[in-house]
Amino acid sequence: MTEDRNFDDIAHKFAKNIYGSDKGEIRQVIVWEDLEQLLSQLDTQKVPLHILDAGGGLAQMSQKIARLGHRVTLCDLSSEMLQLAEQDIANNGLLEQYRLVHSPVQTIQEHLDKPVDLVLFHAVMEWLAEPKPALQNLLAQVRPGGMVSVMFYNYHGLVYKNAVCGNIPHVLEDMPHRKRFKLQPQKGLLPEEVYQWIEESGFEICGKSGIRCFSDYIGNMKNMGEYQYEDLVALERKFCRQEPYLSLGRYIHVWAKKKQ
């Protein structure tokens, strides 16, 4: 990837296809369970907390946190996505707790007057030309004792998905970019590299989850055993924090605490 992806051209389609789907619902269920655990580890004496939702799209997760009484700075490269987020936040009666900033994550420090308590950085790195420095810059904005929540498109999940779909030559060719898939990231990140970047920035990893460890690999329903959507969610919740399933998730969510 030669430049960062801006979703101005497909913001409405992105919102519908990503957030308004079963896949999006599974993602929110798992990540919110993690965030509840994360928030319990933050200093609850400090209320409200200041959250940075970096590249936050429609701010689905940070709105859940805002409902608990906390303040959020939401930034995004896409002005169209920010407008959609503002409408959604206003509809939910949370606009007073938000500050919306039209900015890439790489320069968000210019809009912050002090370190934040928590950074959310979800499903952004796989769309960036240089994900490592972007992540490192955001980690630098967290106060000592603060937390970070990072979700990224998993390279191992991308390999496995292509293999089970029979796209074996594509995998053997190292999965070159295919322009026709606008809503699907074309490159995954290696989990071990992302973990290293976080730890090198002075953070201790507190937990990890695989997002959609099973649902994306299930084939044609006509040839499958019978189950309900609720069963699938229960399966994901049961195994998403256990290896080897965790490392086969289409996304991986990792959260960490900055050392004092």
Task: Give the predicted meaning of each segment.
Residues G207-Q260:
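A C-terminal cap/extension of S-adenosyl-L-methionine-dependent methyltransferases
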Residues Q60-T107:
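Class I SAM-dependent methyltransferase SAM/SAH-binding core
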Residues K132-M147:
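A short glycine-rich, Lys/Arg-flanked "PGG" loop and its adjoining helix->strand segment in the class I
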Residues M1-G57, Q60-K64, N92, M147-D174, G219:
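Conserved class I S-adenosyl-L-methionine
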Residues P185-G202, K208:
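Short alpha-helix
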Residues L120:
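A conserved beta-strand element that flanks and buttresses the S-adenosyl-L-methionine
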